[in-house]
Regions:
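A short tyrosine-centered beta-strand micro-motif
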Residues: 156-160
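Short beta-strand edge segments in extracellular beta-sheet folds
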Residues: 172-175
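Bacterial N-terminal signal peptides
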Residues: 8-18
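Extracellular Ig-like/FN3 beta-sandwich strand-entry sites
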Residues: 94, 153-155
């Protein structure tokens, strides 16, 4: 298990997500522009979760354009990036988020120490709790992991809390 931080690479992927999230926040479907009720969850009055997605991050074979593909299955291939993106509207400039990543068994490694926030592990080694305080900027918060040699196969779960309130739960299979 390895936490990945590819800021420049991720920004290109996230900009695509932002367009869809902004359309949804405006009551429009990102696919066809039709009016739909916005999927909005209120968090602590000042913060609203607009949309959240889980999936795979990848690059073109030539190392060009990054891609985000929604998925509920992560290939058990070392180096495969996966994670979540959540669009948030807030009158706050900084947002606190907490991620609880639960694996079916403890991995060989959780990777390098967290450099942008805090990470704690459960006593049994199956749960990593990552917390960060981030600038909201373009309205997107995210986290990504890379599959590492020795990661367990099976059902994983990520719970994301924004400003102390459960915002999204992502369940997916690694195989």
């Amino acid at each position: 298990m390895k936490n990945t931080t590819r800021i420049v690479w991720m920004l290109a992927v996230l900009s695509t997500f932002a367009v869809a999230a902004n359309a949804q926040a405006a009551g429009k479907s990102a696919e066809d522009g039709a009016s739909t009720p916005p999927a909005v969850m209120e968090i602590a009055q000042a913060t609203r979760v607009i949309r959240g997605e889980f999936g795979l991050f990848s690059e073109d074979a030539d190392g060009g354009e990054p891609h985000f593909v929604r998925s509920k299955t992560v290939p058990l291939v070392p180096g495969q990036s996966y994670g979540w993106v959540i669009a948030v509207r807030s009158n706050q400039q900084r947002i606190h988020w907490r991620e609880e990543l639960t694996l079916p068994a403890s991995p060989v490694t959780w990777g390098a120490p967290e450099t942008q926030g805090r990470r704690a592990l459960s006593d049994d080694g199956r749960v990593a709790i990552t917390e960060r305080e981030v600038d909201l900027g373009d309205g997107l918060i995210y986290n990504a992991w890379d599959v590492a040699a020795g990661d367990p196969q099976g059902r994983y779960r990520i719970r994301v809390f924004v400003e102390g309130t459960l915002a999204k739960v992502f369940e997916f299979d690694v195989r």
